[in-house]
Amino acid sequence: MPGVTVKDVNQQEFVRALAAFLKKSGKLKVPEWVDTVKLAXHKELAPYDENWFYTRAASTARHLYLRGGAGVGSMTKIYGGRQRNGVMPSHFSRGSKSVARRVLQALEGLKMVEKDQDGGRKLTPQGQRDLDRIAG
């Protein structure tokens, strides 16, 4: 369907399709520590899905498509959540900076993302074309 963009499709189906594309291409550089890491300080366990790095990369690429100029700090805010403190009140906790940084570096290696002159990262025209092609 011509003219279909990432904004027009269901986000969950798109992220799954993009993650499958990234895994099938085999070009995404996955760190060796992916099976032992938690994704945030507020998480109790590591992710159950063994392909979580591809899913996180797809989700990050989608976020950069929708709002470019996001860096490591804003990605930690996006993937943050509620920190439970037992009997004390809950507070917001950010996601892992190391995971966000490695995902952005891996997407830079695929030439989907580049550093923005105003700070943060943005999608390259090639990356935007890939995302629109997968959405269609």
From Swiss-Prot:
Chief location of this protein within or outside the cell: cytoplasm
Modification sites for N6-acetyllysine: 23, 111, 115
Annotated compartments: Cytoplasm; Nucleus, Nucleolus
InterPro entries cross-referenced by the UniProt entry: Ribosomal_eS19, Ribosomal_eS19_CS, WH-like_DNA-bd_sf, WH_DNA-bd_sf
GO process annotations (BP): ribosomal small subunit assembly; ribosomal small subunit biogenesis; translation
A GO molecular-function annotation: RNA binding
Keyword list, A-Z: Acetylation, Cytoplasm, Methylation, Nucleus, Ribonucleoprotein, Ribosomal protein
Superkingdom of origin: Eukaryota
Positions of post-translational Omega-N-methylarginine modification: 67
Region of interest (Disordered), residue spans: 116-136
GO cellular component entries: cytosolic small ribosomal subunit; nucleolus; small-subunit processome
PROSITE patterns in alphabetical order: RIBOSOMAL_S19E
Assembly: Component of the small ribosomal subunit. Part of the small subunit (SSU) processome, composed of more than 70 proteins and the RNA chaperone small nucleolar RNA (snoRNA) U3. Interacts with RPS19BP1; the interaction is direct and mediates the integration of RPS19 in state post-A1. Interacts with RPS19BP1.
PANTHER family linked: 40S RIBOSOMAL PROTEIN S19
Functional summary from the UniProt entry: Component of the small ribosomal subunit. The ribosome is a large ribonucleoprotein complex responsible for the synthesis of proteins in the cell. Required for pre-rRNA processing and maturation of 40S ribosomal subunits. Part of the small subunit (SSU) processome, first precursor of the small eukaryotic ribosomal subunit.
Recorded family membership: Belongs to the eukaryotic ribosomal protein eS19 family.
Name of the protein described by the UniProt record: Small ribosomal subunit protein eS19
